[in-house]
């Protein structure tokens, strides 16, 4: 994980590469990763991981020192290694060669060089990551929080928030913040889009639904386990059972003494949530003003 200052003062900024140019490179590379992953059949979490890896690499390395498409392909190859499907190297190399040769297949000798080059860059990425490939994603948490906090709008807000989570990988949000911060940020933006109350609103009604998860002095690990094991289908289908929350006894005093944001996650900080929301929203603002950039990305 990086902090915001490390992102702002990354090596590209130190070399006076303008922020808008850095964004152009990042958005184009992430779009290439997205398009290629769809063609070769990668799941959305593997696609997101590839974007996360490529963003990580160019926080530490100059854009001008590397072939960005090769880094994108190597990121896809590394992320696809966790899939149960067959090795994706050949499919990734084919997509690279089609772009490199303007729609034509590469000769066998050239194709072999492409394979070797992408494999070499994959090893470079692993070294940069210190052989640790992150596996935290916001998607499951979006499902859990949607069910708990929006039982009446569950499917609608989950669908929008998942789309926003996919788009969040065009930003550095997932390189800076834990998955619960990103998940809750996506829910805030989704609720704004759907024009329904957000968890930032003072009068947000469903915050007490989190009582279903909490117990006194719960640890972060226990909280995540409780989120994972709760029977959400039961809660969504039988909303009348939520009335039980109102009947809980004095033992709930512990929960009531927590701050609003501690009720959402034991160590959630409001500043992190707000900063993450703004970072993701900046991407959408850039897409609205994409004529300022020399590339095309559909929302």
What are these regions (language model features)?
Residues 1-299:
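Non-catalytic, interaction-prone regions of core transcription and DNA-replication machinery
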